[in-house]
Amino acid sequence: MYLTIWLVSILALGTWGQKFNRFCHYNSWALSRNPQHGLVPEDIDPFLCTHLILGFAEIDESGLRLKDPNHYQQEYLYQRIVRLRRINPRLNMILSVGGWDKSQEGYSKLVSSRENILFFTKWIITYLRRHDFDGLDLDWEYPTFKGSPMGDKKKFVDLVENLAYEFDIEEIPDIKWKLTLTWTADPLESVRTSAYDIKGIASKVHNVNLKMYDFHGHWDDPLQVNHHSPLTSPNSPRNVNELAKSWVKAGVRIEKLILGIPFFGRSFTLKTANMSVPGSPAVGPGSDFGDGIPIHNLCHIIRGGTKELYLPEKKVPYIVSGSEWIGYDNPRSVMEKAQLVFNNALAGVMIYSLDMDDHHGTCGRKWPMMMAVIHGLNAYMEYIDSKHKSLELTFNKKILRARVSLRNYRRRNQQEKVAEMEQRIRHLEQELQQSMGNMAYERQQAQAMLNRGVSLPPIEQQSWSW
């Protein structure tokens, strides 16, 4: 069922030709996960996302620059991430500054003076260009919170205005695109009214990324089990649908609005094991100790026999294992959230985070959550075509380089090299022809699947059994 926020049917009719942004977070600590679940940049499918957000860079003690990436051994990580553009030249690379534990002191220092803001604005452009990033994401969590002065709310707007202005007027002859500026924000009313001048910020950035998760957790008081990212809810405004509506009413244009989708669950330890319905009392976080449980872990729990339960009024699943209660998203629920974006012509989705999906396919097919999002956005054929065009372009580049080498060898009368290069060109042309045949078949199969229709699986069907 398609949900509509504003109930304007003519709007939904216009979305079929629209391409939706797919912002995907990739966290630097993804490399430190155990070998079974770690995700190195080279294993990322660069066509799954339109934008890859690398998190998180940290503002240094002076408030004027970012900390040296070597401080986090990230210099090489930057290079490895950006190298994905060799496979998909259209992939946008965004550097995110801040995050939950790296925001407050640095941002407050940065905006503490006009001089700091002006210096940082010039400096960050050079930094982004040097590391081959396409844009900057501001993830300050949050102005006026955790010791941040009340004046930081207005000063954050000043920072955004200066960045937007300098990004816009930047003129470099060999650069064919302008830098992108995005803002990642907490959608909850309690944060929104205190921390943000929504109109002031949203009018200057290209996209507003709403963190549509962590609405509930072990920090709640009183502490009760509740799903942290419900799509809808009849009894609380803390749900994706209502919060999206509230931000549009607050002044964010729908063509800028990006909805965050979590690829992790939040756990609680029940006070009484046999009292597990939502709203039951809890005594603290579960086995994740408050860090969140990635989908690539949850799928094994479910495949191991733990029964998946469903909250029809919230359109999200949860499980109970002993005294542990875990609310999470599965392929069905993220597809439905993506359909909300599609049906209302929003700008797209933000995935948090790509490295939490079952990217190795240990529970079935690879990237089950990401593929569900792509289907929900009706973007599967776009995904297939992008991969095919890139592969064809790669082969043609190899053939062109080989032919240039062949001409040089002939000019030098290096007959042995000529024979080797002629054989290489024949092999490349054969591989290209075979690949084109495979691509045509794959596209035909994809179109047939889409013609049959990709529907939501039955509620009673357990995830990762499809």
From Swiss-Prot:
Molecular functions (GO terms): chitin binding; endochitinase activity
Protein EC: 3.2.1.14
GO CC terms, sorted: extracellular region
Compartmental location: Secreted
Signal peptide range: 1-17
Keywords: Coiled coil, Disulfide bond, Glycosidase, Hydrolase, Secreted, Signal
Protein name, per record: Putative chitinase
Organism: Pinctada maxima
